[in-house]
UniProtKB/Swiss-Prot annotation:
<dbReference type="GO" id="GO:0016836">
    <property type="term" value="F:hydro-lyase activity"/>
</dbReference>
<keyword id="KW-0456">Lyase</keyword>
<comment type="subunit">
    <text>Heterodimer composed of a large subunit (PMDh-L) and a small subunit (PMDh-S).</text>
</comment>
<dbReference type="GO" id="GO:0019287">
    <property type="term" value="P:isopentenyl diphosphate biosynthetic process, mevalonate pathway"/>
</dbReference>
<comment type="pathway">
    <text>Isoprenoid biosynthesis; isopentenyl diphosphate biosynthesis via mevalonate pathway.</text>
</comment>
<comment type="function">
    <text>Component of a hydro-lyase that catalyzes the dehydration of mevalonate 5-phosphate (MVA5P) to form trans-anhydromevalonate 5-phosphate (tAHMP). Involved in the archaeal mevalonate (MVA) pathway, which provides fundamental precursors for isoprenoid biosynthesis, such as isopentenyl diphosphate (IPP) and dimethylallyl diphosphate (DMAPP).</text>
</comment>
<keyword id="KW-0414">Isoprene biosynthesis</keyword>
<dbReference type="InterPro" id="IPR012016">
    <property type="entry name" value="PMDh-S-like"/>
</dbReference>
<dbReference type="InterPro" id="IPR002840">
    <property type="entry name" value="PMDh-S-like_dom"/>
</dbReference>
<dbReference type="InterPro" id="IPR020794">
    <property type="entry name" value="PMDh_S"/>
</dbReference>
<feature type="active site" description="Proton acceptor">
    <location>
        <position position="62"/>
    </location>
</feature>
<comment type="similarity">
    <text>Belongs to the AcnX type II small subunit family.</text>
</comment>
<protein>
    <recommendedName>
        <fullName>Phosphomevalonate dehydratase small subunit</fullName>
        <ecNumber>4.2.1.182</ecNumber>
    </recommendedName>
</protein>
<dbReference type="Pfam" id="PF01989">
    <property type="entry name" value="AcnX_swivel_put"/>
</dbReference>
Length: 132
């Protein structure tokens, strides 16, 4: 199944979905050395974003979050791709400077349509995702 969206950052990646209904603060919410979500009370607390297609409504918190996403990439623990309901500048810039394929504004709500563990391919260049 293909779902059309809006391109944020080009590229193509496939991975298992990691889905959250909670917004993510990368600064203080995700350990840049390990990729583990460390924000207490977060739906993904204790889970690791490495190699996943990370699906969440959008970002929250400090503008430094862009650089935390970049650190995740430099440390080899970044998500393979990201999907937001509606991206905001912090996460979008983080994806762009890190070269992480990213889309938002899909025709269907990704948080409701996609389940943890589903195999998802993000074609950031075309603004399309594929579920298999």
């Amino acid at each position: 199944m293909q779902i059309k969206g809006h391109r944020i950052c080009g590229g193509r990646a496939t991975g298992p979905a990691l889905v959250s209904k909670d917004a993510i603060s990368f600064l203080g919410g995700v350990d840049p050395g390990t990729g583990t979500v460390i924000e207490k009370g977060h739906a993904l607390y204790g889970k690791n974003v490495k190699g996943t297609v990370l699906i969440f409504p959008g970002g929250k918190g400090s503008t430094v979050g862009s650089y935390v996403i970049y650190q995740l990439m430099k440390n080899g623990v970044a998500p393979a791709a990201m999907i937001n309901i509606k991206a905001e500048p912090i996460v979008a810039v983080g994806a762009i400077i890190s070269g992480i394929p990213m889309v938002d504004r899909l025709e269907q709500n990704p948080v409701e349509t996609i389940k943890d563990g589903d195999t998802v391919t993000v074609d950031g260049t075309a603004g399309i995702i594929e579920l298999s």
